[in-house]
C-alpha cells in the first residue's frame, strides 16, 4: 500500500468517500442527517476561506490587470463555453446529468493550493499565481452558480430559486463574514494551519460522500457502463488538453514573461473540486449532485497527474543559444594548436 500513501491526500480522501458511498451509501433518514452535517461543514469551510483568501494581496494585485483580466476571461469565459460545447456534444453519449457536468466543470474557478504549488515548482511567479487563484475563487463564490444556471438553461431545472438561495446562505454569507473578520482572525487561522487544512479536506470529502450516496441509490454503477466510462474519460482528457494548451498559448499571445506565463497556465487550466463539491451539495439534491460532479472529479484527478511532470519539465532551464563569438572560439583554439 506504499503507492497509495504517495498519492495526494485530497485525492485519497475523495477515493475513500466514493468507495464508502458505493458500499455504504447514506439513505433515508441517514441521508438527511448527512446532508445537514455536510451543509454545516460547508458553511464553516467557506467562512474559513473568507478568513484565508488574501483580500489585501488581491487588491494590490489588481494593478496587474494585463495578467488578471485574461485569467478571469479564460477561466470563466473560454472554459465555460468549452464546457457548454462538451455538454451539448455528449448529451447523446452519456446520461444527461453527467453530460451537464462538463458545463459545471467549465464554470468552476481555479484551485488555490495546487495551482500555486505547481506554479512554484515550475519556476512561475508565485505572487501572480496566489493573486490569480484568490481572485478567481472570490469571483467564483458569487458567479459560478448564476453562470451555470444561465448557460444550462432548462438543464438547470433542478436548481431553482431555492438552490440559489442556499448558495447565498451557505456559501456567500459565511465567505463574506470571513472576509469582514479577516483582520481580526487571520492570525488565529495562521496559527492553526494544519488543523484548518484538515477541516477543508474533511468538508469536501463529506460533500462528495453525500452526493455520491444519492447517485449510487439512483443506480450510478449500472447507469454508466464501460463504454460510457471510456467516453467520459476520453472527453475529460480532451477538455484537459484544451485547458492546458489553450492557457499556455494565450499566455504566449499576451507576451507575458515566462514567470507570469507559467502562473497563467496553472491558474487557467486547474479546476477546483474544493468549490465544486460543496456548491453541488448545496445546489442539487444528492441524486443529482453525484452525477453532475463526475466530470469534475475525473478532471481533478487527471490535472494532478499531468501537473507534476509538466511542472518538472517547465522547471528545466532553457538551453542558451550560443552566439557567434562562442561558436568561433573552439575553431580558433584548434587552429592555434
Functional labels for PLM-detected ranges:
Residues 1-93, 149, 153-255, 318, ...:
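Structural signature of multi-pass alpha-helical membrane transport proteins
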Residues 60, 113-125, 249-252, 280-285, ...:
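Helix-loop junctions at the membrane interface of multi-pass solute transporters
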Residues 65-72, 93-107, 124-134, 229-233, ...:
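The feature identifies polytopic integral membrane transport proteins across all domains of life
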Residues 73-82, 107-112, 128-149, 168-171, ...:
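Membrane-embedded alpha-helical segments of transport systems
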Residues 87-143, 148, 152-163:
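Membrane-interface helix-loop-helix junctions at boundaries between adjacent transmembrane segments
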Residues 213, 238, 251, 265, ...:
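Generic hydrophobic alpha-helical scaffold/packing signal
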Residues 243, 247, 261, 276-277, ...:
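Short amphipathic alpha-helical surface patches that serve as generic macromolecular interface elements
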Residues 273-337:
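C-terminal transmembrane helix pair
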Amino acid at each position: 500500500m506504499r503507492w497509495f500513501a504517495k498519492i495526494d491526500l485530497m485525492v485519497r480522501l475523495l477515493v475513500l468517500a466514493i468507495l464508502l458511498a458505493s458500499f455504504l451509501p447514506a439513505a433515508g433518514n441517514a441521508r438527511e442527517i448527512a446532508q445537514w452535517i455536510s451543509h454545516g461543514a460547508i458553511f464553516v469551510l467557506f467562512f474559513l476561506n473568507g478568513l484565508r483568501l488574501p483580500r489585501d494581496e488581491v487588491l494590490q494585485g489588481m494593478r496587474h490587470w494585463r495578467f488578471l483580466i485574461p485569467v478571469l476571461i479564460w477561466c470563466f469565459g473560454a472554459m465555460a463555453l468549452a464546457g457548454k460545447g462538451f455538454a451539448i456534444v455528449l448529451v447523446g453519449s452519456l446520461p444527461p446529468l453527467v453530460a451537464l457536468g462538463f458545463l459545471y466543470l467549465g464554470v468552476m474557478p481555479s484551485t488555490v493550493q495546487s495551482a500555486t504549488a505547481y506554479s512554484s515548482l515550475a519556476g512561475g511567479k508565485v505572487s501572480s499565481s496566489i493573486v490569480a487563484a484568490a481572485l478567481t475563487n472570490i469571483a467564483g463564490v458569487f458567479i459560478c452558480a448564476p453562470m451555470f444556471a444561465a448557460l444550462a438553461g432548462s438543464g438547470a431545472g433542478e436548481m431553482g430559486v431555492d438552490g440559489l438561495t442556499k448558495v447565498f446562505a451557505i456559501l456567500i454569507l459565511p465567505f463574506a463574514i470571513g472576509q469582514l473578520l479577516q483582520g481580526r482572525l487571520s492570525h488565529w487561522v495562521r496559527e492553526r494551519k494544519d488543523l484548518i487544512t484538515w477541516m477543508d479536506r474533511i468538508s469536501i470529502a463529506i460533500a462528495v460522500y453525500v452526493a455520491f450516496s444519492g447517485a449510487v441509490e439512483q443506480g450510478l454503477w449500472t447507469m454508466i457502463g464501460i463504454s460510457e466510462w471510456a467516453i467520459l474519460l476520453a472527453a475529460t482528457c480532451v477538455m484537459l488538453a484544451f485547458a492546458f494548451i489553450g492557457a499556455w498559448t494565450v499566455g504566449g499571445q499576451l507576451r507575458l514573461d515566462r514567470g507570469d506565463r507559467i502562473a497563467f497556465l496553472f491558474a487557467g487550466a486547474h479546476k477546483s473540486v474544493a468549490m465544486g463539491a460543496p456548491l453541488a451539495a448545496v445546489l442539487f439534491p444528492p441524486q443529482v449532485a453525484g452525477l453532475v460532479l463526475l466530470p469534475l472529479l475525473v478532471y481533478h484527478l487527471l490535472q494532478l497527474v499531468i501537473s507534476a511532470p509538466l511542472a518538472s519539465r517547465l522547471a528545466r532551464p532553457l538551453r542558451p543559444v550560443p552566439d557567434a563569438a562562442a561558436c568561433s572560439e573552439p575553431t580558433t583554439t584548434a587552429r592555434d594548436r
